[in-house]
Every structure is written in C-alpha cells, then in structure tokens.
Amino acid sequence: NIFNSIEVSKILHKFFNQKPKIIQSMYFEGNTATEEHQDSYFLDSENIGTLTAGWVALEEIKADAGRFFVIPKSHKLDIKKNQYYTNILSNHDKYIRELILESDLEKNSIRAPYLKKGDILFWNSLTIHGSLNSYSKTNSRSSITFHALPINHKFLHWHKHFIDTPYD
C-alpha cells in the first residue's frame, strides 16, 4: 500500500516535522493533459503552502506519454487570495498565465522528469504543475497522486472552508 508505506511516511514526516495524514488521492489511468495549476486554491493546509503532494509512477513514464511536470521555483511566487472580483477558481488558467508572465518564470522552464515505476515526485501546494499532452497511442501514464497535511493541521478548501479530517 503506497499510502501506508514507511518510506513515504518518513519523507512526509521530514517535510512536516510531524506525522502526516493523507487527505486525498487520485488514480490516473489515461493520458489526458492537465493544465498547469496550483493545488492551493482547491486544497491546502490552514497554513497555506504546507500541503505536500506526491505523484507516484505506476509504470515507466515514456516521454511521449505526456509526463507530469513542475515549474521550479514557482512555489516562491506571491500567492493572490481568491476574492470575489478575481475569481481565481473559475479563471485559474488565466490566473496562472498572468502569474507566469508577471514573474521571472518562463513557460519553457517546466521540468518533466523521467520517472520509472515506483518513483515519486513531491511538490507543495503553491508549485505550478500539470501533465503534458500525450503523443502516443500505445504508451500510458498510469499514476497515483496524493495530497497530505501535517496531522494536526486543518484542511482548507477553496481558501475559505475548513474541513474536518479525523485521523486515528
């Protein structure tokens, strides 16, 4: 079980300096592209930027299968609070494009590393990330993504709702 793995738990414990709790996981079987985004507006810790996610390769991810990518240093950009007048949630793609343009980051600065089966790429909720388009009819991108918080943190949803996440 990936989520109960001692190794994953130890890594998350090092990030948080306390025991982690996983609040969401998703299984991806297909090769659909995912636009670049920050997780923070959808889910985060009460301490914005603390949520840590992991992308687990369930097979060797070939370059033409549409690899997972991150934009290095994007977690250091000033985050804008979701407000009624900015409506970042409904216009997230526009917001990300503007954020990249306003910063020193270039869209071509993305990193889509080779990952073999069992490799995990970690990022925090402020890191801009996504999945590239697939150019293969035969290679897939089977993976699991999980999102974790420090065990005593509250789960913040849409930057406005706290959700109780009990643990044992």
For each feature predicted by the language model, list its residue ranges.
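Non-heme Fe(II)/2-oxoglutarate
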Residues: N1-N4, A33-T34, K80-Y85, N91, K117-F122, L126-D168
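Signature of the catalytic double-stranded beta-helix
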Residues: N1-S25, N47, L58
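Short, conserved phosphate-binding/catalytic loop or strand-edge motifs used
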Residues: F28-T32
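Acidic, metal-coordinating catalytic segment for phosphate/diphosphate chemistry
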Residues: Q38
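Short, conserved beta-strand element in jelly-roll/cupin
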Residues: D44-A63, Y114-K117, F122, H147-I151
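Double-stranded beta-helix
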Residues: A63-I128
